[in-house]
From Swiss-Prot:
Membrane-spanning residues: none
Name recorded for this polypeptide: 2-methylisocitrate lyase, mitochondrial
GO molecular function, one term: methylisocitrate lyase activity
Catalytic class of the enzyme: lyase
Keyword match Mitochondrion: yes
Single Gene Ontology BP annotation: propionate catabolic process, 2-methylcitrate cycle
Activity regulation behaviour: Inhibited in the presence of NADH and NADPH. When Mg(2+) is present, Cu(2+), Hg(2+) and Zn(2+) inhibit the enzyme activity in some extent.
GO cellular component labels: mitochondrial matrix
Keyword Transit peptide: yes
NCBIfam families in alphabetical order: isocit_lyase (TIGR01346)
Organism for this UniProt entry: Yarrowia lipolytica (strain CLIB 122 / E 150) (Yeast)
Entry function: Component of the methylcitrate cycle that catalyzes the formation of pyruvate and succinate from 2-methylisocitrate during the metabolism of endogenous propionyl-CoA.
Coiled-coil region list: none
Known cofactor(s): Mg(2+)
Amino acid sequence: MLRTRFINSVNSARAMSRNINTLSQFPYPTLQQEESFFKSQVEDIEKWWASPRYEGIKRPYTAEKVAIHRGTLPQTYASSVQAEKLFNIFTERGKQGLPVHTTGSVDPVQMTQSAPHQEVVYISGWACSSLLTTTNEVSPDFGDYPYDTVPNQVDRIFRAQGLHDKKAWHEWMSLSHEERVKRDQEGKGRIDYLRPIIADADTGHGGLSAVMKLAKLFAERGAAAIHLEDQLHGGKKCGHLAGKVIVPTGSHISRLNATRMQWDIMGCSNLVIARTDSESAKLLSSAADPSDHEYILGVVKPIKPLAEVLLTAEANGATADMVNKLELEWTKEAEMMTYDEAVQRALTEAGKSDKIEEYLTKAKGKSNFEARQIADELAGKHIFFDWDAPKTREGHYHVQCGIEPAIKRALAFAPYADLIWLETKTPDLAQAQAFAKRIREKFPGKWLVYNLSPSFNWSAHGYSDEQLKSFVWDLAKSGFVMQLISLAGLHSNAVATHELSTRFKTEGMKAYVDLVQRKEKELGCDVLTHQKWSGANYLDSIISTVQSGSSGTSSTGGDSTENQF
């Protein structure tokens, strides 16, 4: 009887508390506690969303919808801590008009060497696809590697960051206070290895449930931010390859919302980056979204559909080369154009060019169905236009690419993303600055991302050495707070290995000493003493702490060859 009263008393007291952070407890929670827990969760989420972290961010769902999907055992994630750090970095650098610029790291060595100089780490999907997938099958960046490939690389780098952070902290705190002050004043303070990781999520690797699972995996593995591009899953290509297919604008917004929803459920502050490839993509997977209609290409005269022409040719025994040639000929002869261009031509031919401005004004922002009604009324007749005839064999629509479609998409993505990434085919500073101006006119202060891609032949674009040197900072002034050389790690790895291998063939150890050891000493590269770099001293310290008399088995004892340095 006393025990029952005690339990009831405990439950009653807990039910009155609003500080319950989990219902996974014993004694088991009451209905009143469950109601209190849910209500507090909703209030916490709403307060979280109202913070400066989410200023200007739009969600198509309520805090109740998030809380009801969270379960009763909330967890915390290290990636969310890193995300808050990343948000603060972007906030400060954005105010200063300075860049957060980084090089893509492909392994722990590159991560540690960039940590003293770059504020973030970037993990490229291209690099993962070509260097290390979870099946060990390497290939071009077609987005067809297992979806856990990049998260696994993030996990690898994040774990390495953890080790080197512990190692650096151990070394730093082993110094006297006076020595730490002295080094700090000399600019030789503790290295921060916990640089926030930004990772490549490609297209999200599937439908919305796949996108959510991928977002969850990234958060669990340590990524502070991910970027999602508006290409079609299954048709994805590297942003600097031809043949890219983009999805409807609304479909990509759904991916962004799915990612945000997943992280809201997890209670993570991770950042969502929306990338558009529409500046160079020439195909669209569906015409379902009216906002894409003005850029879809069609024909203005009845013609046998392209897909039908190709299938007929194949059925008649045409070779692959013959079919490809036939496709090029059809596309060239069809004279494709947008509906607006078709209307302008029709009005001009009908002697009604004075109606063009009226049409463009009335049709602006309208669906193709509505635009057709406006055009037919002004023309006094039906204007023929067929955007289905040019569809590819896969059913994709041809679209007009360029900076205008990219701006329109970026503006549509902006309310749902923390940063906007414009993928371009050339390193055009003026184009990027114009893009930034258009975006920031509607979304003041919006952070932008630029890929300083190695796919560009930088020396062939007319930049002087001084212009190349200032390019990153010039971009930053326009709002491109995040800039990255996505494959710098891959290329620097290749160059260093190529030079060493070439010279080692004929010069033997002289090549190694000249190109590696002497350079490591000159530059102060800590991998010179690779045992210490890998954490041998740190681990010895732990072992000697738990086991006395272990100096004879210490890995860094007098017999270690590293004492030669």
